[in-house]
A protein has these predicted regions:
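Membrane-embedded catalytic interface detector for glycan/lipid assembly enzymes
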Residues: 57-61, 87-231, 244-257, 403, ...
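N-terminal "leader" segments that precede or initiate the main folded domain
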Residues: 1-99, 187-194, 210-254, 389, ...
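Membrane-interface helix-loop-helix junctions at transmembrane boundaries of multi-pass membrane enzymes
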Residues: 22-27, 172-185, 377-390
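Hydrophobic alpha-helical segments
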Residues: 340-443
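Hydrophobic alpha-helical transmembrane segments
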Residues: 2-11, 68-78, 112-124, 149-166, 281-292, 353, ...
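Hydrophobic, membrane-inserted alpha-helices
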Residues: 9-14, 165-170, 189-197, 345-349, ...
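Small-residue-enriched transmembrane helix-hairpin modules in multi-pass membrane proteins
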Residues: 143-152, 246-367
Length: 443
């Protein structure tokens, strides 16, 4: 089954990506984190539903139709998000705006670059003098900042500012793309961020997302929509390539299938089944009639960020940590949580674990609307060099991505975010009043 359905899933992903690119490539740049996560989840659930080994349940999975149900649940987001973002970009008329970083109205590009370098150097120094570099000490970055961080405010800079710094560096590199010497210094600074991430033992998350954030900033200033060229999808070449992939999977899994010493099978199961095993587990409970709706628990989940000033993602009463106990065998979940690790999941998994498919389906519509607004406003703020507004939008967007990826409501509903939401509402009111005479919309 995997040798048939995985190539088919690749084909769907390629066609979907091409259609978005031909509509507006900026959509891919602004929503890259969400698209990659969604595509990985899509391929993962198909791989699992075709019979992957799930270590949390200590067994091979079997077909339950979970892949079909996931596709239906994510469909509103997959279809609406690109459409709404494209509409928002055109409505604001910001896709053709071209302004330069470091204008006379704001902070100069040189000073901004120096501040970015100082922040990166500060974080690198903190890791190097700590005496416990995570890469060589086998500890995660969270534990490092809790127990081994030396310099003050290092964690605040790392958690709140470093991701945005990667966007700013990308924007600078994009604007200076015709000056190779100047462009190199921004790429060097970005390279320092990646070195920091490696030292912090962030070998996957923390590498590709920072690279995509840099690309986002670069693309904002590098791309000119008026010169956009649409590409024709090479159907024959894609089908031939996917046929080869299917044959390779078939040979590999018929020759080496279910061998305890087969590294190829282990690698594929870890790559493809790493992401969405929790959804398969929760869906199986529904499928077997073992699920009991917990509406009160769902309300508490939504309010979890307001019940405590600093609620932990590892709290077994909420979010994906709660799901871990529902889908894992024995004490596996407890052992993972005690080590500081979460299973992979998403907002669909968490909502499905409380109130079922209907609310999960509706949530995809809501999330598509909110994320498209955030992406469009972030793009406009970066392009007009309103760094404060851009930072606020980017921070909120990152948290929505974490919610999209992990599913804990406390990530987007808490006291800190309540202040940010009120701030954005005030910005919107001010923008409406200032643009009323000119006939423009709000920010």
């Amino acid at each position: 089954m995997q040798s048939i359905f995985i190539p088919l899933s690749f084909f769907v992903v390629i066609v979907y990506t091409f259609r978005i690119y031909n509509r507006n490539p900026l959509i891919l740049a602004l929503g890259s984190l969400f698209f990659i996560e969604m595509i990985w989840q899509f391929i993962s659930i198909i791989w699992i539903d075709c019979g992957a080994y799930i270590s949390e349940q200590l067994r091979y999975s079997y077909y339950t139709g979970a892949s079909i149900r996931y596709t239906l649940l994510i469909m509103p987001f997959a279809c609406l998000f690109p459409y709404l973002l494209d509409r928002n970009l055109k409505r604001k008329k910001i896709t053709t705006v071209r302004l330069k970083l470091g204008s006379d109205k704001g902070i100069s590009k040189q000073i901004l670059y120096i501040l970015c370098l100082l922040a990166i150097g500060y974080l690198l120094t903190n890791v190097l003098i700590s005496g416990a570099i995570p890469l060589f000490s086998h500890i995660n970055y969270s534990r490092f900042y809790d127990q081994y961080s030396v310099l003050p405010f290092a964690r605040i800079i790392y958690d709140y500012f470093l991701p945005f710094i990667s966007v700013i560096l990308g924007g600078m590199a994009g604007e200076a793309r015709k000056n190779n010497k100047e462009t190199k210094i921004y790429f060097i600074a970005m390279g320092m961020i990646l070195v920091l991430q490696l030292l912090l033992n962030c070998k996957f998350y923390g590498l590709y997302d920072y690279i995509l954030q840099f690309v986002l900033g670069f693309f904002v200033f590098q791309y000119d929509l008026s010169k956009h060229t649409k590409f024709k999808l090479p159907i024959k070449a894609i089908l031939i390539g996917l046929l080869g992939v299917g044959i390779l999977l078939y040979i590999s899994y018929t020759k080496y299938s279910y061998s305890e010493i087969n590294p190829f099978q282990y690698l594929l199961d870890r790559v493809f089944a790493l992401q969405y095993h929790t959804f398969w587990g929760i869906d199986k409970l529904h499928h077997e009639g073992l699920f009991t709706s917990d509406t009160i628990g769902f309300v508490n989940e939504i309010l979890s960020g307001f019940l405590s000033l600093d609620i932990s993602r590892l709290n077994p009463d909420y979010g994906i940590a709660r799901v871990m106990y529902m889908v894992s065998a024995g004490t596996y979940a407890r052992d993972m949580l005690s080590s500081g690790y979460l299973f992979a999941g998403s907002y669909l998994t968490v909502i499905l674990s409380y109130v079922g498919y209907l609310f999960a389906f509706i949530s995809s519509f809501i999330l598509a609307f909110i994320v498209s607004k955030l992406c469009a406003n972030l793009y406009g703020s970066i392009l007009t060099k309103n760094y404060f507004a851009a930072f606020v939008y980017f921070y909120i967007l990152k948290r929505y991505y974490e919610f999209f990826r992990v599913g804990n409501f406390a990530m987007i509903l808490n006291w800190k975010f309540l202040v940010l939401y009120l701030f954005l509402f005030l910005m919107y009111i001010v923008s409406l009043r200032s643009n009323r005479n000119s006939g423009k919309g709000g920010f």
